[in-house]
Amino acid sequence: MTNLKLLDGRSLSLHDLHRIIYEGETVGASDESMEKVKQSRKAVEQIVADEKIIYGITTGFGKFSDIFIDPDDVENLQHNLIYSHACGVGSPFPETVSRTMLVLRANALLKGFSGVRPLVIERLLALVNANIHPVIPQQGSLGASGDLAPLSHLALVLLGEGEVFYKGTKTKASFALKEEEIEPITLTAKEGLALINGTQAMTAMGVIAYLEAEKLAFQSEIIASLTMEGLRGIIDAFDEQIHFARGYVEQVDVARRMESYLQDSQLTTRQGELRVQDAYSLRCIPQVHGATWQTLRYVKEKLEIEMNAATDNPLIFDNGQKVISGGNFHGQQIALAMDFLGIAMAELANISERRIERLVNPQLNDLPPFLSAAPGVQSGVMILQYCAASLVSENKTLAHPASVDSIPSSANQEDHVSMGTIGSRHAYQIIQNVRNVLAIELICAMQAVDIRGREKMASFTKKILEKGREHVPYIDQDRMFAKDIERAAKWLKDGSWDFTKMREKERTNHY
């Protein structure tokens, strides 16, 4: 893609980020925002020249904030900050997260409150456009005073140090910069602090988690529709009158979509035909899935605010006339949103696993035990339910809120922190587990409807089944099902799913 997205510090959306992250859209900076950057930079240079005592510009950091820094040591101060704070550990963030961090940090600096030179922003954008993505360890951030350790690893690359992902491999930053003819920079007053004082690690991880979660939320309804057919579920539960009586718009949306997917099915039933009511995991799909959608809307709102937020400290206002120390680096808003996201997505896996149980348990349906082609000789999909149960149980541990914890740091100067980056990492892992649980439900549901007879399926779900069988063949004998789960999950993650039909059933006046 050759389209150019101009960042301005105030209008970046999740839709924009999706194009930049996954479609390779290039980025630049708006002229208006760059003018603001230049004005705030003049203020920083004047503060240094006048030897004013301003935190982070002419003082040390954290507990050292009461130590004045000589003008001759200002550059050294900024470089020492990056080197000393680049102490993350663990596996690196996914490359998509690293790319998102670059975009978000540039966008925050373009608000013009941080006092960096335009050159710093230009270099960040150059890395994005050259597909040079810093290798950033996932562990080590408290989520206040910003994501210090992760962003320090990002900042190292601007100096020509550290490691990057480049052309599919991990290599030295100096090599990648040379290949792309990007000159390393020397940091001057406040620039080191401006690069690392922010919430861009937790927010970037949150963006990727959200984008994957939204796709899974749609897919979970389609998979549940297949399960409804496999279990001859009662369609009356999706009558919109029930859901209007409750009043939650997201619940109504889910019910409408489910009813639409199944509208011409000969496998679903009406109340009283086979049974009076279905179990909750079928009957309450709109209520449970709808509640997850409520959470997704909330998380989206918070992410898009944070994506365009000034999270530095201090901030420069009124064309440099006012420099104020504050706490916009504190990640509590995103920390809470990420905990909420993890909990809501874990619930999709919880209810999915219960539907899996109903598909494989012969006491709960009239299908062959464990959907086996030769019960007894073959185990069928018995252990797939075990795997789903394990993932669901793991999610319950991961869903424990990170934001309720806080450990003081910097000699108790930073005595309350958000742990938001832990929360975003946990939410992301939960979402990976949810995808695998849904992949298992998909495998079981496809097997069930094929046993019932696909000629009786709804036209929409039949198309899904036909596409799904390209990835997971019909199970006529036991095989190594790990590969089936892997292929199904890959289809859910990377496959092209047309959500047009789904969005048609949303109440557009709400979104």
Curated annotation (Swiss-Prot):
- Where is the 5-imidazolinone (Ala-Gly) crosslink found in the sequence? A144-G146
GO biological process per UniProt: L-histidine catabolic process to glutamate and formamide; L-histidine catabolic process to glutamate and formate
GO cellular component, as recorded? cytoplasm
For this protein, the Enzyme Commission number is 4.3.1.3
Q: In which pathway does it act?
A: Amino-acid degradation; L-histidine degradation into L-glutamate; N-formimidoyl-L-glutamate from L-histidine: step 1/3
Give residue numbers for the modification (2,3-didehydroalanine (Ser)).
S145
Protein name according to UniProt: Histidine ammonia-lyase
Q: Which organism is it from?
A: Halalkalibacterium halodurans (strain ATCC BAA-125 / DSM 18197 / FERM 7344 / JCM 9153 / C-125)
Q: Highest lineage ranks of the organism? A: Bacteria, Bacillati, Bacillota, Bacilli, Bacillales
- Gene of origin? hutH
